[in-house]
Amino acid sequence: MWHLKLCAVLMIFLLLLGQTDGSPIPEVSSAKRRPRRMTPFWRGVSLRPIGASCRDDSECITRLCRKRRCSLSVAQE
């Protein structure tokens, strides 16, 4: 009879031990974290959509920068 009690105690212990591994405790931070900004390297490397501001043709997905905007056509009225 004592082995049934021991088995029950071990099962309860194992169940409780499994619960402690469930989810991490969230860190309490007094200061809000800022989202990471894109570095100048990635800002220059990433291709921009039509209508986005640009400095030269290499920044645009269409490879056409007209009047500091990414354009779809070569000649713009």
Swiss-Prot record:
Q: Which residues form the propeptide?
A: 23-37
GO BP annotations listed: defense response to bacterium
The UniProt entry's GO CC annotations, sorted and at most eight, read:
extracellular region
Asked whether the keyword Magnesium is assigned, the reply is no
Parts of the chain that traverse the membrane: none
Please classify the protein's predominant subcellular localization into one broad category. Answer: secreted
Which InterPro entries does this entry report, sorted A to Z?
LEAP-2
Pfam families, A to Z? LEAP-2
**Which controlled-vocabulary keywords does the entry list?**
Antibiotic, Antimicrobial, Cleavage on pair of basic residues, Disulfide bond, Secreted, Signal
Query: Signal peptide span per the entry?
Result: 1-22
Compartment(s): Secreted
What intrachain disulfides are recorded? 54-65, 60-70
Family as reported in the entry's similarity comment: Belongs to the LEAP2 family.
* Biological role: Has an antimicrobial activity.
Protein name as catalogued: Liver-expressed antimicrobial peptide 2
